[in-house]
C-alpha cells in the first residue's frame, strides 16, 4: 500500500498522458502524493515504475463507472485526506453548450 507520508494528496483523472500527466508530474515535483486515475493500464504501469510509491499510485478504470470511482476514493482515503481533485479526464462531446441536459453532465 502506498503511503503519502504527511504529503498533501491529489487525485488527477486522465493522469496517464497529456495535460493530466503533466499536472501529476508537477504536483509530485512540488511534494504532493498523486493518486492517478486513467483507463490506460499499460501507461499507468509505466508511471508506477517511474514514480516512487510515496509519490504516485495508479488506479486503472473508467470514471464513468460509479462503483470504480467509489472504490478508488475509498482506497485513496485510506492513504490520507484528499486535498485536491483535478478532474481532467473527459469524454469528447460535440453538442453546443445550450444543448446539454442535466444528465449529460451529472
What are the residue ranges of the model-derived segments?
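Canonical Rossmann dinucleotide-binding motif of NAD(H)/NADP(H)-dependent dehydrogenases/reductases
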Residues: 2-33
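Rossmann-fold scaffold of SDR-type NAD(P)-dependent oxidoreductases
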Residues: 13, 82-90
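Flexible cofactor-recognition loop at the NAD(P)H-binding site
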Residues: 17, 90-93
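The beta1-alpha1 cofactor-binding region of Rossmann-like NAD(H)/NADP(H)-dependent oxidoreductases
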Residues: 42, 60-71, 102
